[in-house]
């Protein structure tokens, strides 16, 4: 057995999983019988994949074909990554050793990263961290998944996940599962500090005791209060260090929160365990007091917020969740409820100009979304199985298209056509004169955005716990 990218081989070799590949791509041979002229060539490609190549090599080749003949952007890698998600899920269901699954997953993600670097692509188009988190649903072992993620140092920063969360003090962003407030303005760099105590004027420690005694000497109505002196000291320190975000495990001072909201400084109180994990990952100290902060205690993150999905939740005093979906390119700012969001996704998926043909898979995806929302508007727990199934079906058809693309490239067809399989019984080719021809890039963008919205909604149940209903007296 050969090792995977230099790692020691563990009991199973990926090349032994040819039945898995065959199950994912067997439909391609039946579909391609529509054109007898190319059936034998495509069958040779499929059989060559099954006999000579591993899953990893097949995925890598698909990525290469996609980038060469389709796009040079991160969406190609994202598609291949999500496709691998379905393969990993099948591996786990077959009872394969989880260690092997994680090694294979890490190998594919690393290959995707290599391709991204080779084509000088930015990371915001591919949420590799979210991909690995999604794979954890299949592996059911976060420690193993973390090993796969840990090597991707350039793709595991705080900028990977952005979820807008409404709180009583100020809005906040979810960065990799950590709640951080924001005024909504975009900054090129985030400078974050972590505190393990309260952030208020009555937090008793050396340095603030003397201020209280001095304040009592001044004439009433003219003497600055203890909180004012403390606020002046803290704001001066924040300005000197150019702090943009504060994570604190204790209480928040309302005056400081107001000051931060007016000056575009993020501030939020969250769990101590969450801050400890973030502090450990970023290799910075958790400070007891803000005035003890130095430049080396600040986490600096470069933000590349382009075409992101943002989600706004308003749980306090309400019985529903509000979604805010924003994008620099395609989606303008809009504040809508979960039900309305699902309706919009479903409408987009049913648009014949975007999704010609039946669009069976996409329709099932939107119906699943609607069904889940009807069951529980607050979305405390989402089941990922159905969404994963439909996403895997789409990816399966997409990879079948890639195999045909490779055949066209081999036959020196310079006029490579846009195409995609809309269902398992028909083959759609581009018809420039038609108003509803199937443009693969548009279709891929539509379902990928719908799937990303679903993934964000799944993450909400983990990051945000809605307030419990009032107890009946």
Predicted regions mapped to residue ranges:
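Non-catalytic interaction/clamp surfaces of large macromolecular machines
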Residues: 1-10, 17, 65-198, 202, ...
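Generic N-terminal targeting/processing segments that precede catalytic cores or assembly contacts
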Residues: 1-66, 250-251, 255, 262-267
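Flexible, glycine/charged-enriched surface loops at secondary-structure junctions
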Residues: 25-33, 73, 99, 118-127, ...
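Short, ordered loop/turn segments at secondary-structure junctions
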Residues: 82, 96, 106, 198-200, ...
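A structural-propensity feature for long, helix-poor, extended segments
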Residues: 90-138, 294, 298-310, 322, ...
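Extracellular/luminal Protease-associated
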Residues: 191-270
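Conserved phosphate-handling catalytic cores of large alpha/beta enzymes
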Residues: 268-335
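Extended, low-charge hydrophobic alpha-helical regions
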Residues: 328-473
């Amino acid at each position: 057995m050969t090792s995977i990218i230099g790692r020691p081989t563990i009991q199973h070799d990926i090349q032994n999983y040819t039945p898995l590949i065959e199950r994912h791509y067997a439909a391609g041979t039946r579909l391609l019988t529509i054109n007898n002229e190319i059936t034998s060539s495509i069958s040779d490609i499929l059989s060559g994949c099954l006999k000579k190549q591993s899953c990893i090599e097949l995925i890598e080749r698909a990525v290469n074909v996609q980038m060469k003949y389709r796009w040079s952007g991160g969406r190609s890698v994202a598609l291949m990554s999500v496709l691998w998600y379905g393969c990993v899920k099948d591996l786990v269901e077959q009872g394969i050793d989880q260690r092997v699954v994680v090694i294979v997953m890490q190998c594919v993600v690393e290959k995707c990263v290599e391709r991204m670097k080779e084509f000088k692509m930015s990371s915001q188009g591919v949420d590799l961290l979210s991909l690995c988190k999604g794979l954890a649903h299949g592996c059911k072992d976060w420690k193993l998944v973390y090993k796969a993620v840990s090597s991707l140092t350039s793709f595991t920063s705080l900028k990977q996940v952005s979820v807008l969360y409404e709180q009583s003090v100020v809005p906040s962003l979810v960065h990799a599962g950590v709640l951080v407030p924001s005024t909504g303005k975009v900054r090129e760099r985030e400078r974050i500090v972590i505190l393990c105590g309260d952030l208020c004027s009555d937090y008793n420690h050396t340095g603030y005791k003397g201020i209280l005694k001095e304040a009592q000497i001044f004439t009433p109505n003219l003497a600055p209060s203890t909180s004012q002196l403390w606020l002046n000291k803290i704001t001066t320190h924040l300005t000197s260090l150019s702090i943009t975000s504060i994570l604190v495990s204790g209480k928040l001072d309302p005056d400081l929160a107001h000051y931060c909201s007016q000056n575009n400084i993020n501030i939020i109180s969250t769990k101590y365990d969450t801050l400890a994990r973030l502090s450990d990952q970023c290799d910075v100290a958790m400070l007891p007091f803000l005035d003890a902060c130095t430049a080396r205690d600040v986490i600096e993150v470069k933000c590349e917020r382009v075409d992101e999905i943002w989600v706004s939740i308003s749980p306090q005093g309400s019985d529903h969740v509000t979604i805010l979906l924003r994008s620099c390119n395609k989606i303008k700012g809009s504040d809508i409820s979960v039900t309305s969001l699902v309706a919009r996704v479903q409408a987009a998926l049913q648009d014949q100009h975007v999704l010609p043909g039946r669009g069976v898979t996409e329709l099932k995806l939107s119906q699943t979304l609607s069904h889940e929302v009807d069951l529980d508007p607050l979305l405390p727990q989402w089941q990922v199985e159905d969404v994963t199934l439909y996403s895997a079906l789409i990816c399966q058809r997409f990879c079948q298209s890639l195999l045909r693309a490779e055949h066209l490239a081999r036959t020196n067809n310079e006029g490579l056509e846009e195409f995609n399989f809309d269902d398992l019984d028909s083959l759609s080719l581009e018809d420039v004169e038609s108003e509803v021809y199937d443009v693969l890039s548009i279709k891929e963008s539509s379902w990928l955005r719908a799937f990303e919205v679903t993934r964000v909604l799944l993450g909400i149940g983990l990051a945000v716990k809605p307030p419990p209903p009032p107890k009946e007296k």
